[in-house]
Curated annotation (Swiss-Prot):
GO terms for molecular function: DNA binding. It is found in: Nucleus; Chromosome. Protamines substitute for histones in the chromatin of sperm during the haploid phase of spermatogenesis. They compact sperm DNA into a highly condensed, stable and inactive complex. Testis. It comes from Dendrolagus goodfellowi. This is Sperm protamine P1. The gene is PRM1.
C-alpha cells in the first residue's frame, strides 16, 4: 500500500505543475480575490501596477 500511495501522489504533483503553467493568469486572478482581505497592500499593489503600466505603455508607444 505504501508504494502505491507514493506513486499516486507523484503523478498528481506532476499533473498539477503542468496545469499551472497553462492557466497561470486565471489561477492568479482567483487567488487575489480570496486574499484581498488578508494581504490588501500587496495584492492591490501588484494588480494595479501590472494593469496600469501595461495600459500606459501601450498608449504611449
Amino acid at each position: 500500500m505504501a508504494r502505491y500511495r507514493h506513486s499516486r501522489s507523484r503523478s498528481r504533483s506532476r499533473y498539477r505543475r503542468r496545469r499551472r503553467r497553462r492557466s497561470r493568469y486565471r489561477s492568479r486572478r482567483r487567488r487575489y480575490r480570496g486574499r484581498r482581505r488578508r494581504r490588501s497592500r500587496r495584492g492591490r499593489r501588484r494588480g494595479y501596477s501590472r494593469r496600469r503600466y501595461s495600459r500606459r505603455r501601450r498608449r504611449r508607444y
